[in-house]
């Protein structure tokens, strides 16, 4: 096996329970985003664009759709004879096996996979964030600082800092303290869930952590505090670009809406840093003469006879006459009948919304009444004349 300087390990087994019905049958990294992508596309594309050609993808919760989607990695130019993408679910060894117990345990269980490439460094990534980042620049920073570990950080609003792992740093960016979701944060430098470690050193810490029966087997709760306590050289790598944790319905909806700004901070048209995906084969979209479309993304295979304002339509969506879609995300192959109103909502794949339905905010509601997002599960039928109020999750019948 050809030696690799750095191996990337992408943690993609999370359930994303705060996304409700959107992750009922999908792992969080497989959730659709931006009209034609899935969340994991951003991390995989970052790897390719950064020149990292060996990526292990660790899956666990509802892995079928994600495994099928990734395949051999060809859509991200990661189908290589030496390296490329390898999907790594939990497995059974001679001495038994178990589910991944935490982020650190997931890497521990795949030490043999990493070791076969004899890397000097390991890049650990989360598969459930939306951002574009050149990991090679972070690796250069890691080498320049002669670091044992480097953690990518971004400044977050102070009122949100308690929801993240927070770094306190010296003037030279060396990390002097790490707090996991502190109640009263002393800094607003949040961990992005992107780490570079010297592999042999990390491996020793993973093995030590595994021997501790009281450990949560987690990087934020266990590995990073242990390394700090031991005085290892740990540095914070500042990231200035767009980054969003889409772990809630509201944050996922907002990240989609961010794409519709006149000058979006996340530019999907950047030819120098393309985001790759598995693209469905659909005919061109059609917008009828009577339709009105404003500030929206309309994808292949869509048939629009109604009105679409500030919304994103995934491939194969039909919008009937007299219907209005406003500030919403409509996933693939949804069929919306006539005289339907959908406002500030996310509608799941292949759902049918029959005529005269109203989903989300009522017209002329005050902004405070429309601050929460309505979600409709995929593969269900919403009967004629239904009213689904704001801040609801509409779930189909079991079975």
From Swiss-Prot:
Gene Ontology molecular-function annotations: ATP binding; glucose-1-phosphate adenylyltransferase activity
Alphabetical list of SUPFAM superfamilies matching this protein: Nucleotide-diphospho-sugar transferases, Trimeric LpxA-like enzymes
Domain of life: Bacteria
Binding site for alpha-D-glucose 1-phosphate: 100, 165, 180-181, 191
UniProt cross-references to Pfam families, sorted A to Z: Hexapep_GlmU, NTP_transferase
This protein's pathway: Glycan biosynthesis; glycogen biosynthesis
GO BP terms: glycogen biosynthetic process
Signal peptide: none
Catalytic activity entry: alpha-D-glucose 1-phosphate + ATP + H(+) = ADP-alpha-D-glucose + diphosphate
Entry annotated with the keyword Glycoprotein: no
EC number(s) on file: 2.7.7.27
Keywords: ATP-binding, Carbohydrate metabolism, Glycogen biosynthesis, Glycogen metabolism, Nucleotide-binding, Nucleotidyltransferase, Transferase
Biological function: Involved in the biosynthesis of ADP-glucose, a building block required for the elongation reactions to produce glycogen. Catalyzes the reaction between ATP and alpha-D-glucose 1-phosphate (G1P) to produce pyrophosphate and ADP-Glc.
HAMAP family registered for this protein in UniProt: GlgC
Family affiliation: Belongs to the bacterial/plant glucose-1-phosphate adenylyltransferase family.
Quaternary structure (record): Homotetramer.
Protein name per Swiss-Prot or TrEMBL: Glucose-1-phosphate adenylyltransferase
Originating species: Desulforamulus reducens (strain ATCC BAA-1160 / DSM 100696 / MI-1) (Desulfotomaculum reducens)
């Amino acid at each position: 096996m050809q030696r690799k300087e750095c191996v990337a390990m992408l943690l993609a087994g999370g359930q994303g329970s705060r996304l409700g019905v959107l992750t009922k049958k999908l792992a969080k990294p497989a959730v659709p985003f931006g009209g034609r992508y899935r969340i994991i596309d951003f991390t995989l594309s970052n790897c390719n664009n950064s020149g990292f050609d060996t990526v292990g993808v660790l899956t666990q919760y509802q892995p079928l759709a994600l495994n099928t989607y990734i395949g051999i990695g060809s859509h991200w130019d990661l189908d290589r004879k030496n390296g490329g993408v390898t999907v790594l679910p939990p497995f059974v060894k001679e001495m038994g096996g178990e589910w991944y117990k935490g982020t650190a345990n997931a890497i521990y269980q795949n030490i043999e996979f990493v070791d076969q490439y004899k890397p000097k460094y390991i890049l650990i990534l989360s598969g459930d964030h939306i951002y574009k980042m050149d990991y090679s620049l972070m690796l250069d920073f890691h080498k320049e600082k002669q670091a044992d570990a480097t953690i990518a950080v971004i400044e977050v609003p102070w009122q949100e800092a308690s929801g993240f792992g927070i770094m306190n740093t010296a003037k030279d960016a060396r990390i002097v303290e790490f707090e996991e979701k502190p109640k009263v944060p002393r800094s607003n430098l949040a961990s992005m869930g992107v780490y570079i470690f010297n592999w042999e050193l990390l491996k020793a810490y993973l093995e030590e952590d595994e021997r501790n029966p009281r450990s949560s087997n987690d990087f934020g709760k266990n590995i990073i505090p242990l390394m700090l306590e031991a005085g290892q050289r740990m540095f914070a790598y500042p990231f200035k670009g767009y980054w969003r944790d889409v772990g809630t319905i509201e944050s996922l909806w907002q990240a989609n809406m961010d794409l519709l700004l006149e000058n979006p901070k996340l530019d999907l048209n950047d030819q120098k840093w393309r985001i790759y995906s598995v693209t469905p084969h659909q005919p061109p979209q059609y917008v009828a003469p009577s339709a009105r479309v404003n500030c929206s993304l309309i994808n292949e295979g869509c048939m629009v006879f109604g009105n679409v304002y500030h919304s994103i339509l995934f491939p194969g969506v039909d919008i009937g006459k007299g219907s209005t879609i406003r500030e919403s995300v409509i996933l693939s192959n949804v069929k919306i009948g006539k005289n339907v109103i959908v406002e500030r909502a996310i509608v799941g794949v292949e759902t049918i919304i029959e005529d005269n339905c109203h989903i989300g905010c009522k017209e002329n509601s005050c902004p405070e009444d429309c601050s929460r997002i309505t979600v409709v599960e995929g593969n269900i039928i919403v009967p004629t004349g239904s009213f689904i109020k704001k801040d609801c999750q509409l779930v189909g019948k079991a079975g």
